Amino acid sequence: MPIYDKSPRPQEFAAVDLGSNSFHMVIARVVDGAMQIIGRLKQRVHLADGLGADNKLSEEAMERGLSCLSLFAERLQGFSPSSVCIVGTHTLRQAQNAADFLKRAEKVIPYPIEIISGNEEARLIFMGVEHTQPEKGRKLVIDIGGGSTELVIGENFEPRLVESRRMGCVSFAQLYFPGGVINKENFQRARMAAAQKLETLTWQYRIQGWNVAMGASGTIKAAHEVLLALGEKDGFITPERLDKLKSEVLKHRSFNALSLPGLSEERKAVFVPGLAILCGVFDALAIRELRLSDGALREGVLYEMEGRFRHQDVRSRTAKSLANQYNIDREQARRVLETTMQMYEQWQAQQPKLAHPQLEALLRWAAMLHEVGLNINHSGLHRHSAYILQHSDLPGFNQEQQMMMATLVRYHRKAIKLDDMPRFTLFKKKQYLPLIQLLRLGVLLNNQRQATTTPPTLRLTTDDSHWTLCFPHDWFSQNALVLLDLEKEQQYWEAVTGWRLNIEEESSPEIAA
């Protein structure tokens, strides 16, 4: 037997979940097509504790988060950017100064941090459970985090109902248990508040129904472990066992005094509010039994990344679904996409350092979906389409990707207002502004909505934001309307400082000879 195994090293992936209470990292490798977890790291950061009444993260909370990321960065040395995904959840969604934290994080960990929506978080949690649990049939998945609670019903890797509610064990500790005081009144108020937050979805979830309910969070794991320590051998959570836990909890006067078998010291400060939320969820949905799941958000992120490597990108399904929903003209979308990518390839060859794989994918989807707002009104098409893309639930897209797609579409026609554009942390202006220029030209050259408009020999030359489009000889004699559109487009470009669009025709072959 050879001493050295010369087979290629398995692809490794890392998923990092920046939660409101703890930061988690899980590292896995793909062996024979299966995901194998090879390491986990968890740090309690209490990020949500640092979120003030003004919705700004305190300096202390930021320091705790950055210190943890520095620790994670050590373990991630040598990982390629495409193999690492870091997601921010509720607290970073809420924090008005999240961009400041992300800017400082860039210096600590060399991978982008994606802030995901509550619904996207819920979808990824569900996928993490689906990939890691043997139970078959329709599942209800519940995750009680530090700042939000996610609830999903789905089956066979397809979420059917997806919801995220702003209630978590850290936020409820501050709201309903001031000073860490435990009493019957505080617990009941928290329980009722949780049930009330689910009021609008109760019947929808009950009617959909489920075969098995799974819990995927620190709160549910802690309840499971306390029940095991109290002698409940299967650790399943039932209404009767929740009453038992509640009775045990109410024997104590404060979080600090809390002493339950199986409850870790670090969980004391958030166990009681988490338990109250869990009771409220049971009340609202009439749950009879809840089982603990090993998989959660970070596992969902891992499988999502691995799926993209196998070209099973959920975002493509999302884009197709949206195209169907708004009945877009697929032939026109295809024409715009082909023209835009024809020019993108030329731009990329001239500006390779500015090209970004994620942005290329977003440009493709923006080209495909730029007319989703056509059903509302043609005159404000760009604004309507951008609004739909920005405010729709788009599985697979993080908040910045969704905003970027909306921005590309918002400025694909009419005036260009750079000052009105949102701030991005994952992408730089010099990377995405050329994509706006490309999409504008891709749409303009297909204004006639005919297959013959864009010449196959169209040449694009770029020098920073000074662009030249060169058309075949005598092409404009057959396409006078396109020339008029291009001349109008030149005026839009001239209104932007530093932008210039030159239009040329190749010289006559006779002259060249």
UniProtKB/Swiss-Prot annotation:
GO terms for biological process: polyphosphate catabolic process. Its EC number is 3.6.1.11. GO terms for cellular component: plasma membrane. The keyword Oxidoreductase does not apply. SUPFAM superfamilies: Actin-like ATPase domain, HD-domain/PDEase-like. GO terms for molecular function: exopolyphosphatase activity. It is a peripheral membrane protein. Belongs to the GppA/Ppx family. Homodimer. Degradation of inorganic polyphosphates (polyP). Releases orthophosphate processively from the ends of the polyP chain. This is Exopolyphosphatase. It comes from Salmonella typhimurium (strain LT2 / SGSC1412 / ATCC 700720).
